[in-house]
């Protein structure tokens, strides 16, 4: 981002101003097309790879210079030949570039916030990684959880108004209004009621969609930051980054201290936080050790706070209060709950001995098998009952490609659920994928599974389904003692970017 800033000619005193003229610079479109530019901040663009060229960019900039008024009303834009026959394509290119330009204040504020604290920035950090650190918190002493549906603005103009605190260039905000009014599905951009319209918009404008959503989440999470700063249990933290990143970097800092002690201490990343927070798929979870009355006050406080200060429409019914002792947290393929672990203690007093029954609260994260079987059945690896079937659509591939695809799916699932305390369900998934792979190969060679395995041997599939303990010992061969300790502890892999489907390469 430092190279990006110097290339644009921005300094700290004017980084929020005069963003709009950058849209007339050709190198901005080159930067938008570059996939390797600061992937931690700027999303990878896959919208116009095959069509973008310098000639098209020059033609677009020339038309913008020739047009007297770039920002037009919706009715006038339907009658103007500004964008010509390639209106949709030009509009998509401009929306991608405009979102990059408007991301500059967000990116620079995040970097400056980390520099002030001396925190090393993680380039591969994604929102999904905050789930792993959330599941490592000490939930055994907590009482209630709030399941919150993130509220959405009643009108997209509220999003533009919120951006005024970040972007002080009025022309850039007018350009954003132009793109928002350009699409007829603007009322369903953030809402979840019209998934078809929102999906249509996001597919054509990935970067602009996520930029608007991120700015919306920053406004939404400011209420939690306010409560966090009011708590005596936590330090005041700058709101220069998303709340999930604040938690992540704080936990990573404490995790480094645990590593220096060679795992002699328990891995409680936050000793006694005022609240535990995580956000996922338009929802968020807030866990606390407060009473039901306190959680109910929080519930109505959030509703009134969002409605009064941010004009975010919400209702108390969108926030659910659940007691952690008899409620499990189900989100993104995980099922977590607090259970009582019985234990018996023998006490000796003089000549008398006593047996004391004791119950200890323990927070377990398991891998639910039924959702995984449902995903495998949807992708045609097994039927609804979990019986493996061959992947007929892959029968035309080479043997190495078939085995590699099945092995990649299992490794992704294994990495994603590697931190779970109970992973017996993964053995069922491994069985389904191995037998499905064998049936796919047998179908290709026009043979039976038994004859195929007898001919090539079952060792053909073993190397592609290596256990995680073996992978770790191969990666760190000199620290076998630490690896043995790690094998008994949850291990979270930060190479997971998304888990929306089983085979994201298709």
From Swiss-Prot:
InterPro entries: Domain_X, Maturase_MatK, Maturase_MatK_N. It is found in: Plastid, Chloroplast. One of its GO terms (biological process) is mRNA processing. One of its GO terms (cellular component) is chloroplast. GO terms for molecular function: RNA binding. Keywords: Chloroplast, mRNA processing, Plastid, RNA-binding, tRNA processing. Its main location: plastid. It comes from the Eukaryota. PANTHER family: MATURASE K. Usually encoded in the trnK tRNA gene intron. Probably assists in splicing its own and other chloroplast group II introns. Belongs to the intron maturase 2 family. MatK subfamily. This is Maturase K. It comes from Atractylodes lancea (Atractylodes japonica).
């Amino acid at each position: 981002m430092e190279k990006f800033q110097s290339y644009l000619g921005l300094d700290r005193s004017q980084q929020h101003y005069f963003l709009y003229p950058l849209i007339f610079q050709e190198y901005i479109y080159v930067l938008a097309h570059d996939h390797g530019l600061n992937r931690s901040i700027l999303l990878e663009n896959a919208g116009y790879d095959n069509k973008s060229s310098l000639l098209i960019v020059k033609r677009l900039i020339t038309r913008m210079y020739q047009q007297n008024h770039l920002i037009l009303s919706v009715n006038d834009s339907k009658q103007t030949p500004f964008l010509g026959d390639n209106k949709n394509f030009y509009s998509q290119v401009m929306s991608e570039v405009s979102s990059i330009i408007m991301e500059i204040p967000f990116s620079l504020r995040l970097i400056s916030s980390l520099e002030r604290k001396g925190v090393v920035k993680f380039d591969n950090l994604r929102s999904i990684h905050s789930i792993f650190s959330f599941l490592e918190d000490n939930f055994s002493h907590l009482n209630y959880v709030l399941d919150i549906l993130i509220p959405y603005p009643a009108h997209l103009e509220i999003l533009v108004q919120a951006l005024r605190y970040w972007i002080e260039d009025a022309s850039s905000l007018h350009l954003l209004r132009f793109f928002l009014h350009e699409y007829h599905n603007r009322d369903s951009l953030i809402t979840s009621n019209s998934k078809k319209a929102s999906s249509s918009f996001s597919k054509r404008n990935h970067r602009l969609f996520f930029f608007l959503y991120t700015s919306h989440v920053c406004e939404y999470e400011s209420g939690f930051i306010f409560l966090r700063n009011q708590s005596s249990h936590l330090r005041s933290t700058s709101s220069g980054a998303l709340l999930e990143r604040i938690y992540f970097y704080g936990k990573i800092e404490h995790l480094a201290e645990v590593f220096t002690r060679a795992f002699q201490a328990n891995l409680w990343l936050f000793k006694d936080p005022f609240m535990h927070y995580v956000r996922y798929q338009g929802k968020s979870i807030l866990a606390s050790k407060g009473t039901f009355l306190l959680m109910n006050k929080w519930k109505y406080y959030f509703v009134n706070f969002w409605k009064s200060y941010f004009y975010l429409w919400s209702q108390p019914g969108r926030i659910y209060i659940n007691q952690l002792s008899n409620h499990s947290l189900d989100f993104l393929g995980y099922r977590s709950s607090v259970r009582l672990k019985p234990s018996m203690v023998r006490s000796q007093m003089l000549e008398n001995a006593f047996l004391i029954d004791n119950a200890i609260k323990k927070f377990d994260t398991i891998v639910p098998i039924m959702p995984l079987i449902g995903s495998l059945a949807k992708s045609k690896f097994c039927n609804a009952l979990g019986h493996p079937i061959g992947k007929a659509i892959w029968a035309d591939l080479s043997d190495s490609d078939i085995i590699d695809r099945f092995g990649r799916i299992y490794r992704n699932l294994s990495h994603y659920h590697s931190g779970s305390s109970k992973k017996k369900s993964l053995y069922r998934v491994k069985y389904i994928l191995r037998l499905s792979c064998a049936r796919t190969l047998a179908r290709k060679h026009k043979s039976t599974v038994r004859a195929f395995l007898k001919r090539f041997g079952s060792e053909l599939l073993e190397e592609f389904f290596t256990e995680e303990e073996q992978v770790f010992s191969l990666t760190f061969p000199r620290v076998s003692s630490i690896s043995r300790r790690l094998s008994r502890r949850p291990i979270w892999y930060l190479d997971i970017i998304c888990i929306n489907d089983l085979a994201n390469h298709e």
